[in-house]
Curated annotation (Swiss-Prot):
It is an enzyme of class 6 (ligase). Gene3D superfamilies: 2.170.220.10, HUPs, Isoleucyl-tRNA Synthetase, Domain 1. It catalyses: tRNA(Met) + L-methionine + ATP = L-methionyl-tRNA(Met) + AMP + diphosphate. It comes from Brucella suis biovar 1 (strain 1330). Is required not only for elongation of protein synthesis but also for the initiation of all mRNA translation through initiator tRNA(fMet) aminoacylation. Its main location: cytoplasm. Its EC number is 6.1.1.10. The gene is metG. CDD domains: Anticodon_Ia_Met, MetRS_core. Monomer. Pfam families: Anticodon_3, tRNA-synt_1g. This is Methionine--tRNA ligase. The keyword Protein biosynthesis applies. Belongs to the class-I aminoacyl-tRNA synthetase family. MetG type 2B subfamily.
Length: 515
């Protein structure tokens, strides 16, 4: 039986500097969504990569006295290494400087030409190098420093040059119909409202080529023009699936189930991209989800501003799964969030070390001592036993619904509510006291606790994969019994030998800090 396909992408990162925590946040969250759907039985394809063309790359390279290709090669290797360090399960890594991407970008350009949507004209307007975006005069403002800024707070400059244009104005009504008929196309709702309002205010045709630099994909048939970076960048999502060869087996993954992006690029993904696809007569992605910004104690991070936090250092300092857990649990996905040393330590020590780690250590140590290191044979389940087992089952359904809406924090919240309840159950049943008074009941309580840990261990795999693997290993859960379908279908069998219990989550102790 062929499994349902699920295609998910991050935005491709811009490698004019080193990776920062914002890149890591998007990759970790998207990785968790990809892992979740794999465990849910889907045939998943997960793409990330780097967006290597454009004037910013050229300017950054010139400052360093190297070519843009050298800059792209050097910095892309740091982004690839970040994906490895973060334990990202991406199926492909795309670079827009690859030959396959030149082919795909030129093919979508020609498809838009064939549809009558590209024409040559002259462009004069305000352009932000940092945003790689054009803005109308009404979207800009001159501040006290005498500099004109765009809506993202970045400086804009006046640009005049010959340009090809895309007839974006012809797609205004089609886009508004799309948003109305598919309210889930752009999420969360705040982003959707912004996009609808932007499109309703009137769309102007879009300049889609430049002649003032040559670091980009040449326009087919007019090589002195290179494609405006967003035509090139957005096309990466179909390049990776073999476009323009729609007989490629990977093409079956299109349309994408979700493009996960930062909210600052929602206009490109929710307005320009569907319009380009409509013009090229290609199916539209099912969802564009724009997450919020991460603030370091309240200040927005940006490579261009220079206040970025190195994700490699954070992993080194706190541990990978601790960082993954914190970012997905602490910040409602789609909203802006803030982080600090104290917040990371408090959240990971409380939830991971105390609640989950400690429960596993206490219950499995008791099984090792009192049950010959084997899963105990349970007796009849009491109401309390059934209640905690039922809550664990219900959490999976809650998590599935939450993940359908990219609400990672709600999925984790439901799973960790089970962990908190399991701690209350364990404390209330007092298996250490039952050892003398009712050893059979003690065995049942320890069985139920271990079984809840097994269910939780399976459910947390997308979020904290290495730690979940350790937990499932010490519960002797076979490698082929770790899918979501196994939460109900494959309970622990009494009499199974368990390995010696190992701590799963070390506590973060300030004394460990060597500054």
């Amino acid at each position: 039986m062929s499994r349902e396909k699920y295609y998910i992408t991050t935005a491709i990162a811009y490698p004019n500097g080193k990776p920062h925590i914002g890149h890591a946040y998007e990759l970790i969250a998207t990785d968790a969504m990809a892992r979740f759907q794999r465990l849910n039985g889907m045939d998943v394809y997960f793409l990330t990569g780097t967006d290597e063309h454009g004037i910013k790359m050229l300017q950054s390279a010139r400052k360093e006295g190297i070519t843009p290709r050298e800059l792209a090669d050097r910095n892309t290797s740091a982004f690839r290494r970040m994906a490895e360090v973060l334990n990202s399960s991406n199926d492909d890594y795309i670079r827009t400087s690859e030959e396959r991407h030149y082919k795909a970008s030129q093919a979508i350009w020609q498809a838009m030409v064939a549809n009558g949507d590209i024409y040559k004209g002259g462009y004069a307007g305000w352009y932000s190098v940092r945003d790689e975006a054009y803005y109308g005069e009404e979207e800009t403002e001159v501040r006290a420093d005498g500099v004109r800024y765009g809506p993202q707070g970045t400086p804009v400059e006046w640009v005049e040059e010959e340009s090809y244009f895309f007839r974006l104005s012809a797609y205004q009504d089609k886009l508004l119909d799309l948003y109305e008929n598919n309210p889930g196309f752009i999420m969360p709702a705040e982003r959707r409202n912004e996009i609808v309002s932007f499109v309703k205010s009137g769309l102007k045709d879009l300049s889609i080529s430049r002649t003032t630099f040559d670091w980009g994909i040449p326009v087919p048939g007019d090589e002195k023009h290179v494609m405006y970076v967003w035509v090139d960048a957005l096309t990466n999502y179909i390049t990776a699936l073999g476009y323009p060869d729609t007989t490629d087996e990977r093409w079956a993954y299109w349309p994408a189930n979700a493009h996960i992006i930062g909210k600052d690029i929602s206009r490109f993904h929710a307005v320009y991209w569907p319009a380009f696809l409509m013009s090229a007569q290609l199916p539209l992605p099912k969802r564009v989800f724009a997450h919020g910004f991460l603030f370091n104690r309240g200040e927005k991070m940006s490579k261009s501003v220079g206040n970025v936090i190195d994700p490699f250092e954070l992993v080194e300092r706190y541990g990978l799964d601790q960082l993954r857990y914190f970012l997905m649990r602490e910040v409602p996905f789609g909203q802006d969030g803030s982080y600090s040393h104290e917040a990371i330590v408090n959240r990971t020590n409380a939830d991971l070390a105390n609640d989950l780690g400690n429960l596993a250590q206490r219950s499995l140590s008791m099984i090792a001592k009192n049950c010959e290191g084997k899963v105990p044979q349970p007796g009849a389940f009491s109401e309390a036993d059934k209640a905690i087992l039922d809550q664990a089952d219900a959490a999976l359904e809650t998590a599935r619904k939450a993940m359908d809406d990219q609400a990672l924090h709600l999925a984790l919240g439901a799973i960790f509510a089970v962990v908190a309840e399991a701690n209350r159950y364990f404390a209330g049943q007092e298996p250490w006291a039952l050892r003398k008074t009712d050893p059979a009941r003690m065995g049942t309580v320890l069985y139920v606790t271990a079984e809840v840990l097994r269910r939780v261990g399976i459910m947390v795999q997308p979020f904290i994969p290495q730690s979940a693997e350790k937990l499932l290993d010490i519960l002797a859960v076979p490698a082929d019994k770790r899918q979501f379908a196994d939460v109900l279908a494959s309970p622990l069998a009494g009499g199974t030998d368990l390995p010696a219990p190992q701590p799963v989550f070390p506590r973060y102790v300030e004394a460990d800090e060597q500054n």
